[in-house]
Swiss-Prot record:
SUPFAM superfamilies: Acyl-CoA N-acyltransferases (Nat)
Chief location: cytoplasm
Protein name: Leucyl/phenylalanyl-tRNA--protein transferase
GO molecular function: leucyl-tRNA--protein transferase activity
Gene3D superfamilies, alphabetized: Leucyl/phenylalanyl-tRNA-protein transferase, C-terminal domain, Leucyl/phenylalanyl-tRNA-protein transferase, N-terminal domain
UniProt similarity note: Belongs to the L/F-transferase family.
Keyword terms of this UniProt record: Acyltransferase, Cytoplasm, Transferase
Localization: Cytoplasm
Role according to the record: Functions in the N-end rule pathway of protein degradation where it conjugates Leu, Phe and, less efficiently, Met from aminoacyl-tRNAs to the N-termini of proteins containing an N-terminal arginine or lysine.
Enzyme Commission no: 2.3.2.6
Catalytic activity: N-terminal L-lysyl-[protein] + L-leucyl-tRNA(Leu) = N-terminal L-leucyl-L-lysyl-[protein] + tRNA(Leu) + H(+); N-terminal L-arginyl-[protein] + L-leucyl-tRNA(Leu) = N-terminal L-leucyl-L-arginyl-[protein] + tRNA(Leu) + H(+); L-phenylalanyl-tRNA(Phe) + an N-terminal L-alpha-aminoacyl-[protein] = an N-terminal L-phenylalanyl-L-alpha-aminoacyl-[protein] + tRNA(Phe)
Lineage: Bacteria, Pseudomonadati, Pseudomonadota, Betaproteobacteria, Neisseriales
Enzyme class: transferase
């Protein structure tokens, strides 16, 4: 049994999350911005399928990536050096989140519902959600979006319409984070893709303790003011 959250009702302690399905903590009827921000500060995130109530999760263990430990595969390193592309931030948030929501042959129904798009677009207007875009020949080719509270970044979803396009954006942002002292990003659940970049699982208690520390610290003021244009000879 999980908690049903009425309006303004607080989240239960994350230690009450189920072990099966791993991390399921609570459910609610809607997804207001205020509750979403509170969730991130508590180490909780929403994930639900179309037609379901909003389900809130805090799995144990938790997948994270430390930007200073980023591993870029050799094949991607060659792409970063030799392909012509431009990486930008916060230039096309709406296009990025809609592209992440688009159905694919492997995923005909996306968890990124119109309600998710609306709420995260509000976070973007508040300066809390961000997008990173890869452009090839002037066209949006890939990217991802996430949420940043203080010095804590929470990755959400990515897409690619050209080979390696989302990986290019991801690698550049992680190196930017490493250079600006951003210690940890939340990857939510284990995937082989993130593990190849150096992601690893840590105990939920360690994750929540780090989140409490990092969300209370201000992010560097110029963190999201950059772009990169790669023009190999």
């Amino acid at each position: 049994m999980i908690a049903w959250l009425d309006e303004d009702e607080p989240f239960p302690p994350v230690e009450q999350a189920l072990t099966e399905p791993s991390g399921l903590l609570a459910a609610s009827a809607d997804l207001p911005v205020s509750r979403l921000v509170t969730a991130y500060r508590r180490g909780i995130f929403p994930w639900f399928n179309p037609g379901e109530p909003v389900l809130w999760w805090s799995p144990d263990p938790r997948m994270v990536l430390y930007p200073a430990e980023l591993h870029v595969p050799r094949s991607l390193e060659k792409v970063l050096r030799h392909r012509r592309y431009t990486v930008t931030v916060d230039r096309a948030f709406g296009s990025v989140i809609r592209a992440c929501a688009a159905p694919t042959p492997a995923r005909p129904a996306s968890w990124i519902t119109p309600e998710i798009i609306s709420t995260y677009s509000q976070l973007y207007r508040l300066g809390l959600a961000h997008s990173v875009e890869t452009w090839i020949d002037g066209q949006l080719a890939g990217g991802f979006y996430g949420v940043m509270i203080g010095r804590m970044f929470y990755g959400e979803s990515m897409f690619a319409q050209a080979p390696d396009a989302s990986k290019i954006a991801f690698a550049h942002l992680m190196r930017r984070f490493a250079g600006h002292g951003i210690d940890m990003i939340d990857c939510q659940m284990h995937t082989a893709h993130l593990a190849r970049f150096g992601g690893r699982e840590i105990p939920r208690s360690d994750f929540v303790a780090t989140v409490n520390t990092l969300t209370a610290q201000p992010a560097p003021p110029d963190l999201w003011r950059w772009s990169h244009c790669n023009e190999p000879a």
